[in-house]
Each structure stands twice: as structure tokens, then as C-alpha cells.
């Protein structure tokens, strides 16, 4: 229990006070408007108040907040209160945008200090989505089970404020945040991300959710470290039996008042944890009994510490050899590659069967075709159709749009073990482009291709920059070059998941 408290205090030692006065500084709102600290915010676009963001409005808002001594809502008129007046929607968005910038400043400074010096290049590479897959290639082939858990959303807004309270001691800022949440956020729409983004500032919403998740992960990391600080002894079978009784005394018991149960943690150095959006993934070399214990650890952690109701059905356990993990636009699984080795010893020969475990990454072709169908590039069966909304654009713009989408998908799915599915996606986009151009010129596809020839669509099949570099190093007919073309390539410049993949 004492170690647990010390661990949390060390993680929260870098607290920053007195953030509230920054709300009355005009340059904070200028930063929010100009996205000065928003370069990494690539999933959402702040809309709805950009054209209303002017210096006089900010000054009136600051003066009105400065003159007001306390935040009191009018019980008679919910649309007008003594703090924000008539334009409460505009003012609330401005305060939310400014508060998002303010609370991000301490964390941004820590990120900048971490990424300086020799760690700059590594930190840049770690920001890539593809950086996780080389790690999976090295680790997943040695693991047995994978546990997928859906992180429950907070059922009450106060949970988000309490999570931020551990990091920010400024009570005034927290009171202002609490007031804004309760005054301008509908509880049901706030829980649903798609609706809440249109009402509340998406940047602040994402920050609050990440701070809540960070608090949960910090506790889980403590439990994981407690369960794996004792490494297995590298020795023979009989020596392991000797050391076994010495290991028993190190099996620790972690107890916390809110859990109501004692958590017995077994030592396992082969636990790997990944969080992707609202899903936690835990891969382990444990037996089915121990991985089931981790399943109930998740449920107890959410229920008794964070007061989040989570059913055990939201946590799934699967065996890696029989299951494909849907993760970041890939279906990842462990595949056995059998190989037969012939050994000759004097006059006797032997056949040795050897199976090697490798990570198999495939494209989820069905879901990707479904995304292309929603975007009106093909029908539900994968047959290309024209894009009528683009038919009014110039031919060069139409071709450029299709080529850009095709190259982005090829770039993102370059790590696929099988390229056949990728070629099918490129085929759909190519003939969707042809049908769109034929529709624009009021012609059939056959007549259009016969008139202009198929050479004008060569951009779909031109070499990528990487293939061009390989062609300069190796001869065109060299076997190693063909092997490189078929191999997996992971890029460390991909920091955003493709829109078509994300909506699949």
C-alpha cells in the first residue's frame, strides 16, 4: 500500500499551480485561435467560432469575467446568465479553447524537454503509428494469449474533473472547468464522442479523456511492475526447483481500500500492454488461468477505484494462434511456418520438422471495401462505380484525387504480408476514376479508354519513392529487388491513421 502511494506521488510530483490567471490573458485566446499548440491535433478541426474570434470579443469576455466575483447561474432564464450574457455558446467555446491551451502548457513543456537532445530522433520515430508493428513482430510470436478490453466511458462529468485534480492544484481553474461542463454539456451527448464534439471543444474533451486514461494506466503500470519485477532464473530444470521455494516469498500482495478484495499478483515478465483509442490490449505468455485473473483485475480496477461499471463481457481473451487482432487497420495474427530440414549422418538421413512462429499482418479487405462503399467508390460487393460529386471538377483534379487516395492507402498498408488485397483496392480506385471521367464526358468506359488510351492512368502504377531508390541500388531483374517489393515495409513518418481505415 505504501509503495502504491509513493508511486502515485512521484508521478504527480510535477504539479503546476496558478493556471487560473492565464485565462484573463488575451494571448491565450490568440494561441487557441491560431492553433499555436495544436500542431498534433490532426483528428479534429475546430469549427464554429473561427470567424467570430476577434480581439474586441476577447476583451469584452475578459472584462466581464474580471468584473464578476462569483459564478452564479440564473434559475429563471437558462439562456442568459450573469457571467456570459446572451452569447453563452460563443463565450463557452472561447473559454473551453483557452482552457485547453492552458492545461496543455505544462504537459507540452514536459514533452519538449523529453524530445530534446539525443532522444529527439527516437521520440519522433515513436510518434509513428507503424513503430508499434516492428515491436509486435519481435514480441507477439513468443506470446500465447491476447486480452482485449474496452475502456468504459465516465458516467459522470465529475470523474473527469477528479482525474485532472491530481495533476492541477489550482482550485479556481477546476471550478471554472466544472462550471463549464455542467452548464454547457448535455450528459448524454458528452458521453457520445460524435455528438459532444459538435457541442463542446474537441481539444478539451480529448485532453480530459486522455488525462482520465493516463490515471488508469499509471495504476495499471504499477500493478504490472509489481507482477514482473522478479525475472525468471536462467537455469536447468533441477535448479529451477531449488529456486522455486525462494521465489514464493516474493509473491506480493497489493491491497487498496477501494478494491474490497486482495489482488494476488503472479510474476510474469512477458506482459506487453498497448492502448489504441478506447481499447486496451494486453498480450502475455501466461496460461489461460493467469490471463483470466488479469481480466478480473481490469474489471475490479475500473469498478472500485474509478467507479466505472464494466461487465466482464467487455474484456475478451483469445489465443493468438487462433485469432486475428484487428488493430490499426491490420489483422494481426501469429502464423506457423512449417519447414522440413534433411540431415545426413553417415549412411543415415533424417527429416526434421520445424515450425517457426511469425507475425502475419493482413489487410481487412471486407471492412476496407465497406469504407470505399460508404465513400461511393464502389458498391457493397466491391464493384467500382463513378463518383458523381467529383464529376464537375477538372480532369486533372479528378485524377489527382484518386491517385492521392491510392498512394496513401498503399503507403499505409505497405506492411501487409499479402499484397493481393492491396492490388484489389487499387483496382477499385482506378476504375472508379475511369467511370467518373467517362460520366463527366458522357461516354462509356470502353469508348473513353479507346479514345485516350490507358496510359493517362499510369500514375496509379508508377514507382513509389522507395521502389525508385531500390531500383537505383539493384538491377531491375535482380532477385533481391523482387523480394524487397514483396516484403513488409514499415514507415516511421505515418502519424495519422488513414481516414478510410479509421472509418472501417
From Swiss-Prot:
Keyword Chloroplast: yes
Protein origin, superkingdom: Eukaryota
Cystines in this chain: none
One protein family per Pfam: MatK_N
Keywords, in A-Z order: Chloroplast, mRNA processing, Plastid, RNA-binding, tRNA processing
Protein's GO biological process: mRNA processing; RNA splicing; tRNA processing
GO cellular component, one term: chloroplast
Location(s) in or outside the cell: Plastid, Chloroplast
Single annotated GO MF: RNA binding
Role this protein plays: Usually encoded in the trnK tRNA gene intron. Probably assists in splicing its own and other chloroplast group II introns.
The family this protein is said to belong to: Belongs to the intron maturase 2 family. MatK subfamily.
PANTHER family: MATURASE K
Protein name: Maturase K
Record organism: Gossypium turneri
Amino acid at each position: 500500500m505504501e509503495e502504491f502511494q509513493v508511486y502515485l506521488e512521484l508521478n504527480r510530483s510535477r504539479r503546476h499551480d496558478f493556471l487560473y490567471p492565464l485565462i484573463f490573458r488575451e494571448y491565450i485566446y490568440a494561441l487557441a485561435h491560431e492553433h499555436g499548440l495544436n500542431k498534433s491535433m490532426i483528428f479534429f478541426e475546430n469549427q464554429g467560432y473561427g470567424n467570430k474570434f476577434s480581439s474586441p470579443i476577447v476583451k469584452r469576455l475578459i472584462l466581464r469575467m474580471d468584473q464578476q466575483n462569483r459564478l452564479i447561474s440564473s434559475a429563471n432564464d437558462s439562456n442568459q446568465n450573469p457571467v456570459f450574457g446572451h452569447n453563452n455558446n460563443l463565450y463557452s467555446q472561447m473559454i473551453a479553447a483557452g482552457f485547453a491551451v492552458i492545461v496543455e502548457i505544462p504537459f507540452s513543456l514536459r514533452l519538449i524537454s523529453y524530445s530534446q537532445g539525443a532522444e529527439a530522433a527516437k521520440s519522433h520515430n515513436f510518434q509513428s503509428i507503424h513503430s508499434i508493428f516492428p515491436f509486435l513482430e519481435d514480441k507477439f510470436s513468443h506470446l500465447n494469449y491476447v486480452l482485449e478490453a474496452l475502456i468504459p466511458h465516465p458516467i459522470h462529468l465529475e470523474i473527469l474533473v477528479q482525474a485532472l485534480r491530481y495533476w492541477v492544484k489550482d482550485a479556481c481553474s477546476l471550478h471554472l472547468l466544472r462550471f463549464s461542463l455542467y452548464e454547457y454539456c448535455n450528459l448524454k451527448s458528452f458521453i457520445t464522442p460524435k455528438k459532444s464534439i459538435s457541442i463542446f471543444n474537441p481539444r478539451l474533451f480529448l485532453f480530459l479523456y486522455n488525462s482520465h486514461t493516463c490515471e488508469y494506466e499509471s495504476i495499471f503500470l504499477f500493478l504490472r511492475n509489481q507482477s514482473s519485477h522478479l525475472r525468471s532464473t536462467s537455469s536447468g530444470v533441477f535448479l529451477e526447483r531449488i529456486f522455486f521455494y525462494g521465489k514464493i516469498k516474493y509473491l506480493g500482495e497489493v491491497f487498496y481500500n477501494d478494491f474490497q478484495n486482495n489482488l494476488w499478483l503472479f510474476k510474469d515478465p512477458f506482459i506487453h500492454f498497448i492502448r489504441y483509442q478506447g481499447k486496451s490490449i494486453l498480450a502475455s505468455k501466461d496460461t489461460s488461468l493467469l490471463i483470466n485473473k488479469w481480466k478480473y483485475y481490469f474489471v475490479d480496477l475500473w469498478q472500485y477505484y474509478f467507479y466505472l461499471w464494466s461487465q466482464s463481457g467487455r474484456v475478451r481473451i483469445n489465443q493468438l494462434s487462433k485469432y486475428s487482432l484487428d488493430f490499426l487497420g491490420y489483422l494481426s495474427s501469429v502464423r506457423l511456418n512449417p519447414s522440413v530440414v534433411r540431415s545426413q549422418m553417415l549412411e543415415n538421413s533424417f527429416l526434421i520438422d520445424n515450425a517457426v512462429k511469425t507475425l502475419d499482418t493482413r489487410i481487412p479487405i471486407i471492412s476496407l471495401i465497406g469504407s470505399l462503399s460508404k465513400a461511393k467508390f464502389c458498391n457493397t460487393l466491391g464493384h467500382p462505380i463513378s463518383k458523381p460529386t467529383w464529376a464537375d471538377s477538372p480532369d486533372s483534379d479528378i485524377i489527382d484525387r484518386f491517385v492521392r487516395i491510392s498512394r496513401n492507402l498503399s503507403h499505409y498498408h505497405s506492411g501487409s504480408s499479402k499484397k493481393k488485397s492491396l492490388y484489389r483496392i487499387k483496382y477499385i480506385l482506378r476504375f472508379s476514376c475511369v467511370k467518373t471521367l467517362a460520366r463527366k464526358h458522357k461516354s462509356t468506359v470502353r469508348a473513353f479508354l479507346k479514345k485516350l488510351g490507358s496510359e493517362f492512368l499510369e500514375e496509379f502504377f508508377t514507382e513509389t519513392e522507395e521502389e525508385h531508390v531500390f531500383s537505383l541500388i539493384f538491377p531491375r531483374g535482380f532477385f533481391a529487388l523482387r523480394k524487397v517489393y514483396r516484403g513488409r515495409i514499415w514507415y516511421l513518418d505515418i502519424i495519422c491513421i488513414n481516414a478510410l481505415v479509421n472509418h472501417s
